């Protein structure tokens, strides 16, 4: 089946790989022949909520590779990123960026940076936010806080 784009990019921390991350990655592979994955460096995540609980880069990288292998995704490149723009201005042949509704603003920033360098802006492919069984978005922050699991199920706390 012919893909819509030759080269697409997707980025994130991909901490405690959850249903939202998986939906984002699946969409990237659905629309792109080659998927460039920007994985945030440990330095970049220091300002995130519960940053002390974010898994180290190497562990997140291994978890990401495991997901890609289990799903038999082959045409990808994982690159460490140190800021929101990452390598998107260095690979001129990128055609699209895959984001969630929540991270759409990041795609706009990427396109602004590309346009400032005279590069073609990327088409923006947006997936909806994946909701937990509690009705809130599934996020690594909620998983790190111990409120939900990676599938969006609430974690029952022992009553004291």
From Swiss-Prot:
It is found in: Cytoplasm. GO terms for molecular function: ATP binding; dephospho-CoA kinase activity; pantetheine-phosphate adenylyltransferase activity. Its EC number is 2.7.7.3. Its main location: cytoplasm. InterPro entries: CoaD_Thcocales, Cyt_trans-like, PPAT_arch, Rossmann-like_a/b/a_fold. Transmembrane segments: none annotated. Pathway: Cofactor biosynthesis; coenzyme A biosynthesis. Keywords: ATP-binding, Coenzyme A biosynthesis, Cytoplasm, Nucleotide-binding, Nucleotidyltransferase, Transferase. It catalyses: (R)-4'-phosphopantetheine + ATP + H(+) = 3'-dephospho-CoA + diphosphate. GO terms for biological process: coenzyme A biosynthetic process. It comes from the Archaea. Pfam families: CTP_transf_like. One of its GO terms (cellular component) is cytoplasm. Reversibly transfers an adenylyl group from ATP to 4'-phosphopantetheine, yielding dephospho-CoA (dPCoA) and pyrophosphate. PANTHER family: BIFUNCTIONAL COENZYME A SYNTHASE-RELATED, DEPHOSPHO-COA KINASE-RELATED. HAMAP family: PPAT_arch (MF_00647). Belongs to the eukaryotic CoaD family. This is Phosphopantetheine adenylyltransferase.
